[in-house]
Amino acid sequence: MSTSLNVALVAEFDLCEKLAETLEQSCLEIEKLSVVELFPFSEEQGIRFNNKSVEQRPLDETEWSDFNYVFFAGDVTHAAHMAKAAQSGCVVIDLKGVCASLNDVPLIVPSINDEQLVVLQRNIVSLPDPQVTQFVFSVSQFARENTLSQVLVTSLLPASYIDSYTVNKLAGQTAQLLNGIPLDEEQQRLAFDVFPSPKSTASLAAQVEKIFPQLSNVIFHQVQVPVFYGMAQMVTLRSEYEFDAQAQLHAWQANELVDYREAS
């Protein structure tokens, strides 16, 4: 028996647009999709789903009980809205991991620890930071089958990891420099440059440990790089025993969420 869903997207415009595209391509039977404006959209910003315009609602005027699922991409300042939505009976997908540190909220990497979804105490499911998700996909089998003495992760972060404003800023700086126009000396240079990310890594390590308690010694290094989309990572694993690489290769090949390609 199929079930038609009412779904709300709560995010900035660019992310709402991407989420709507992804849901349209999914196998979910969505009867109605709505957008709750985390920040007010401009007049020309509209979302379409299945060739129809999507209803847009102000955040403070939303009746959360209208929805079955809410994809919420707010920060900690929006936590009260997230809690209200969960208390209204809908399942909240916490896309930015605001509730990831709460003991009674599962932190899920799809296909890796789905068993944590069996009991939902708060109607909230948190997703890890993208750095953590990508790292967990890359080492899941190693983590399950080996004792790792040290794990080092270097993440090369694109502009889109921060927000759409940073993407536009990188595009503007790139065009400016290619046209021979120097940047303002007081301006943080993004184009044709790399620099350490100021974001704290403590929460990243804590999220990894919540998913894999045996990985309590993960160290993240973050580098902001001049690319628009796509995050790369370099991972170093240390163990007193020899690794079985084939087990991890088989895990990648068997996972529909991993696009595994052998080096040519």
Protein language model annotation of sequence segments:
Residues M1-Q188, Q214-V218:
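N-terminal Rossmann-like NAD(P) cofactor-binding subdomain of oxidoreductases
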Residues S4-L5, V70, S160-S264:
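Charged docking surfaces used in two-component/phosphorelay signaling
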